[in-house]
Amino acid sequence: MPQLNPSPWLLILLFSWLIFLTMLPSKTQLHTFPNMPSTQNMCKQEPEPWTWPWA
C-alpha cells in the first residue's frame, strides 16, 4: 500500500510548510488598509431623538 510509505508524503508536507512559512508572512505584513483608523472625537454628543414614521 503506497499510502503507508511516509517518504514522499513527509517531504511534500515539509516543503509545503516551508513555503507557507517563508512566503505568507511577508505577503501578510505588506498588506495595507485602505482607510487608516482615526482617533475618536472626545466630546460627548447628545443623541438626537428619532421620530417613528408610523407614530
UniProtKB/Swiss-Prot annotation:
Family stated for the protein in its record: Belongs to the ATPase protein 8 family.
GO terms, molecular function: proton transmembrane transporter activity
InterPro entries referenced in this protein's UniProt entry, alphabetically: ATP8_metazoa (IPR001421), ATPase_protein_8 (IPR050635)
Protein name, entry field: ATP synthase F(0) complex subunit 8
Location of the protein in the cell: Mitochondrion membrane
Cross-referenced Pfam families: ATP-synt_8 (PF00895)
Protein's organism: Latimeria chalumnae
Main location: mitochondrion
Membrane topology: Single-pass membrane protein
GO biological process terms on file: proton motive force-driven ATP synthesis
Signal peptide: none
Keywords: ATP synthesis, CF(0), Hydrogen ion transport, Ion transport, Membrane, Mitochondrion, Transmembrane, Transmembrane helix, Transport
Description of how the protein assembles with itself and partners: Component of the ATP synthase complex composed at least of ATP5F1A/subunit alpha, ATP5F1B/subunit beta, ATP5MC1/subunit c (homooctomer), MT-ATP6/subunit a, MT-ATP8/subunit 8, ATP5ME/subunit e, ATP5MF/subunit f, ATP5MG/subunit g, ATP5MK/subunit k, ATP5MJ/subunit j, ATP5F1C/subunit gamma, ATP5F1D/subunit delta, ATP5F1E/subunit epsilon, ATP5PF/subunit F6, ATP5PB/subunit b, ATP5PD/subunit d, ATP5PO/subunit OSCP.
Function comment: Subunit 8, of the mitochondrial membrane ATP synthase complex (F(1)F(0) ATP synthase or Complex V) that produces ATP from ADP in the presence of a proton gradient across the membrane which is generated by electron transport complexes of the respiratory chain. ATP synthase complex consist of a soluble F(1) head domain - the catalytic core - and a membrane F(1) domain - the membrane proton channel. These two domains are linked by a central stalk rotating inside the F(1) region and a stationary peripheral stalk.
Domain of life of the organism encoding this protein: Eukaryota
GO cellular component terms listed in the entry, alphabetical order: mitochondrial membrane; proton-transporting ATP synthase complex
UniProt-annotated stretches for the region Disordered: 36-55
Residue stretches spanning the membrane: 4-24
